[in-house]
Structures are given as structure tokens and as C-alpha cells.
Amino acid sequence: LPTSVLATALAKVLAERTMAQCVGRGLFRYASRPLRTTGTWRTPRLCLTLRTLPDGNLISDTHAASELDWPEFHNGVASALEIGTAHVDSSWIFAHASASRGGRARHAGFLLGLGLHGHLRRLGRVHAYRYLAPRHVLTTVGLVLGLGASFLGTGDAAARQVMAVQVAAFLPPGSVPLHMSTMTQAAGLLGMGLVFCQTDHAWTAMRLASQLDAPMVDTADANEAHRDAYAHSAGLALGLVYLGRARRTSMSSSADHALLERLCRAVATPLGEASGMAVARTAAASALALALLCLRSGRRDVAEALAPPTPANLAHIRPDLLLVRSLARALVLGDAS
């Protein structure tokens, strides 16, 4: 192959390696850099340009701009995680907003990272809605999940309102449809689960359970776009609301029995490719919900529902479903002592 072709291929590989380093960088440097709130926090953009030797040529544009959105998002998360103990206010956070495409993606991740530190508790409502108004998907995802992490398990009314506006299923009957993207609504569902984590909030759990097998989602996307993310977010959120409930309580009420029966029935339904994407999607989401709801409870009835009926049926279960069910079963039967 020509040298130029090999160099371009190498540049693409090195660029992908650079993009993948962001998550590890955030963990390695967690809370390691001091912050002066009188200045701004610099998040360097991803440098994917390669210089070849000995001719010194520069190779860039190995990836389209759209392919860099999520890597820049994770770059922003990693940068925020490096912040040490500090007190930041709403104006300081909003001052870091950027108008460029890469800058917006980085700042969206920066919001999520600040939320993981708990700093978004201080984000004013006016600034929050100024972030949401442009309907930039990554910014909304970062803000909603960051708020969920900052208000974890508090049931905060203001945070709940921000989540509910993103999800059509949580709007009051007769509301004007907002046509949010499916990814935005998936983030809203998961954010709702974080805000109400381990609160056993029955109404929220009921709304989340209804989205596990929702046939249609009021969205600006094509109906099937990101539907797996939407269903899985609903399952995780439902499990978070009832986190460890089977271990903390006897789950003897009729509502608890009905929920467990519904989830177990959904998990056990699909066998093989002919079962359809929608059924398989619901099964995976239900398994995730069961894993968190019955976390370390030792419930044998739930574990049996998650396991294949016979070893022969292993050949008839999709590999991704088998992975989720095996993981869920292990979490249910984990040491509950």
C-alpha cells in the first residue's frame, strides 16, 4: 500500500485511541486539580492531528465533525471530574458555555461532570432553562443527568420538573406535545430515576413501568431511533426508584406482586430472533429493572425467571439478552448478608 494510505490509516487508529482516553483520564485525575473560582476552567479540545516523519506532513480530518460529538462530551466530563474541592455558583457555571460545535459538546459533558461532583445543586433555575431552550441534545443530556446525580435520592421538586418537561409520558393529559428527541427523553427517564432513587415513589414508578413496553413515543425522531436507549433507561430508572426494595421489604402488597409478575413475564417471553425487536427490547429493560429492584435479595423466584428454563434454550436466546439476564440473576443472588 502507498505510504500515504498507511499514514492515514495509522492516524485514524491513533485518533480513536486518543478519543477513548477521556474516561480513563477523568478517573485517574479525579479531584486532583485546584480551582480558582475567580477564573475560568480550561477544557482543552481533543487534538487528533498527526505529524508524519521524516517528511513532517500533518494529517487531520480523520473523522467527520459529527463523529467527534460524543468524544468531546466525554472530554468535558473528564475535565470536570478533575476539579478538586471548590464552591462554584450558577454564574460561574454558565460563563463556560460555548457556541462552537465542539465547544458545546465539551460543555455538555462539563455539566455532567459538575453534576457528579454535586455542583449543579447551585445552578439557578433561570440558567437551567437557558441551557434547555436551544434543545441541543448533548447539552440537555448532560444537564439532566448532572442534575439527577446532584439531587440523587432527594425527590427535589424543581429537579423533577426539569426531568418531567423532557419526557412526553410525564406531561399532564392534554399538554401540547413538545416533540423532544428520543435520546433527550431517555436522559429524562434516567434522571427521574436518579432524583427518586430508593424513595419507593409509587406514582413515578408506575409511569416508568408504563414506558418499558410503550408502543409509541411522542418524539421528533423516527419511531425506532434510539428506542433501545429509551426502554433501557426506563428499566434502570424503575429499578433505581425501587432500589433494593425486595431486600428492604417483604413486597407483599398486591401492587408489588403485580409489578414483579409483570416484569418476570416480560423477561421470560422472547426466545429466538422471531420474537421481534420490541419484545426483546422490553425483556432487556425488565431484566435491568428486576436486577436493581431485587438487588442482593436472594429471591429465588425472580432468579428462576431470569434463568433459561433448560440448558437447551441457551441456543434460542439472543446473546445480548442472555448477557443482561445473566448479569441480573447474579445481582439478585449476590450475597445478601
Positions of PLM-derived features:
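Alpha-solenoid helical-repeat scaffolds
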Residues: L1-A285, A289-S337
